Amino acid sequence: MATPLKLYRNIGIAAHVDAGKTTTTERVLYYTGMSHKIGEVHDGAATMDWMVQEQERGITITSAATTCYWSGMDKQFESHRINIIDTPGHVDFMIEVERSLRVLDGAVVVFDSVAGVEPQSETVWRQANKYGVPRIVFVNKMDRMGANFLRVVSQIKQRLGSTPVVLQLPIGAEEEFKGVIDLIKMKAIHWDEENKGMTFKYVDIPADLKSTCEEYRAHIIEAAAEYSEELMEKYLEGEEFTEAEIKKALRHLTITNKVVPVFCGSAFKNKGVQAVLDGVIEYLPSPTDIPDIQGVDEHGDVIHRKTSYDEPFSALAFKIATDPFVGTLTYFRAYSGILKSGDTVYNSVKGKKERIGRLLQMHANSREEIKEVRAGDIAAAVGLKTVTTGDTLCDQDKVVILERMDFPDPVIAVAVEPKTKADQEKMGIALGKLAQEDPSFRVHTDEESGQTIIQGMGELHLEIIVDRMKREFNVEANVGKPQVAYRETLKQAVEQEGKFVRQSGGRGQYGHVWLKIEPQEPGKGYEFINAIVGGVIPKEYIPAVDKGIQEQMQNGVIAGYPVVDVKVTLFDGSFHEVDSSEMAFKIAGSQCFKQGALKAKPVLLEPIMSVEVVTPEDYMGDVMGDLNRRRGLVQGMEDSPAGKIVRAEVPLAEMFGYSTDLRSATQGRATYTMEFCKYAEAPTNIAEAIIKKQ
């Protein structure tokens, strides 16, 4: 029996690395009856962390997808189908979070009640804002030393710029944490510890918390009153709101991203997760609550698709994974229509048809075969040949291309070589498969040295890749030292002529172009404009000029690093009836770009990282001094339960080996996180040293 769309919830669970997100997901699976025993992260048995590396490191790397059903703590709802994507919290894997949020309708963001809003959480929040994803918050670990619920609430307001609405208050904290107070029902909830919180009872609010509860309930009423004129009138008249009125108002305000409902508890101690599940149903959108999906047709005209089974089929592939048993899995979110196994779909980005063989409903790493996928579903297809992350699958007679995903360029590179001759071929296959799965991981061969270079978002990212080559593909590799992925760009506009002419008996070569080369704003990328009029260069040679320019850009002009953020206009040139060819124009374009770029004040760009260090106050001076020595710019400082938080922007080149240095400088008491921030021009002395090396 298919679940009606209004009873669907497609949600992600996202958080900082140690906020207890996977534990929260495990409890969700336990209470919804999907797993019969609770898997703990610290003993390496969590269901959603199914890769060996995840179980060893205790962190989540790939987004596992699973489906469960929930009808409320009090069994007060119809059975809702919840598709959950568990996302990684480590900064090197933010790409996984980004692509999950792109296909979700709502998110549960988990915060640690001791650490509060951490850098990773800010990144996740920004990504959720970018895709307009409504969210609810679960403040976890209320049983830990230093737990402070209200401090986290004020950080959500100040650091994340959102409007939190507190729906629960904790009863006690740290070891005294007993349960939570439901501020809408104005009742305390006590979960039964003997059956791991499967049952609970409502009891009266402790007398000493009554006035605080009334104060916070007043905030809820105030927020709800904003929903409609009717409620505002009631509010101004001082009339009571019913529970249904409050929930309806909060649901609307959450879905439109005006407020963020906040829950609290301790997943590890089996308190609070069940109420969060109720919150998912009550406040997060179903596929029918979100705006129609927008895309373009083959002519580039905007079209809308409703989330409905009657519309033509459309879906977005958001993840490719290699499964040891079934081969390539393509995870996709269906937005409209119905897809049955055996159907043929059209990949509108690549212009290729694909026949759908098996369709699978995923549960972490186990799977169940299904006959069809409907709008609103998240599922996986086996063995699709041409689909990569971000491609659209649709009905070939009703073509639509959905908005693609942007993936950041890698910032770090290492050379890898197979340990033995036998590993050589296997390594190529393994790296190809891993690059297909992960759009933020790139592989290429260095033309001069012949070495295989792998690039990624951080040291941990590449460590995991090398680890997976060994475990999943049996390839042993030696790994070089990490190298920084520099870039080059231009500071000045120039016009340049480029001519490639060869005469050597028989047919010659002739290509002649004039290019205008200009710098673009950072992040704008490469733009090629064809401004040829009157056929001075025939149409068929224009793509060759573009190709020649792009190849030269990849090889750099001053230090061999890719040139970024330039606009090139082809505005004049000439051709020869017999001697001109695509090859001649490609070479002319390439040479012309290089000659012009060298006159356009080329500079070297280096990746700058946002670094956040949490340190006891005693070591503050040492930490700051060390960051300055690393060419860091301190952006700000603030207090935290663990001492001081220092925020700085530091070039990646200066950050290798930082964790060891920080540990020894602070006797292992300071911690840090780092994520890519931007590319910036490298100082002259640094740039000269790098150019000399090449």
UniProtKB/Swiss-Prot annotation:
Name the Gene Ontology molecular function terms of this record. GTP binding; GTPase activity; guanosine tetraphosphate binding; translation elongation factor activity
Stored InterPro entries: EFG_II, EFG_III, EFG_III/V, EFG_IV, EFG_V, EFG_V-like, EFTu-like_2, G_TR_CS
**Which residues does the UniProt record annotate as the domain tr-type G?**
6-288
A GO CC term assigned to this protein in UniProt: cytoplasm
Compartment(s) of residence: Cytoplasm
Function as written in the Swiss-Prot or TrEMBL entry = Catalyzes the GTP-dependent ribosomal translocation step during translation elongation. During this step, the ribosome changes from the pre-translocational (PRE) to the post-translocational (POST) state as the newly formed A-site-bound peptidyl-tRNA and P-site-bound deacylated tRNA move to the P and E sites, respectively. Catalyzes the coordinated movement of the two tRNA molecules, the mRNA and conformational changes in the ribosome.
Name the gene for this chain.
fusA
Against PROSITE patterns, the record matches this protein to: G_TR_1 (PS00301), G_TR_2 (PS51722)
Q: Which UniProt keywords apply?
A: Cytoplasm, Elongation factor, GTP-binding, Nucleotide-binding, Protein biosynthesis
The UniProt entry, under HAMAP family, shows: EF_G_EF_2_B
**This protein is called what?**
Elongation factor G
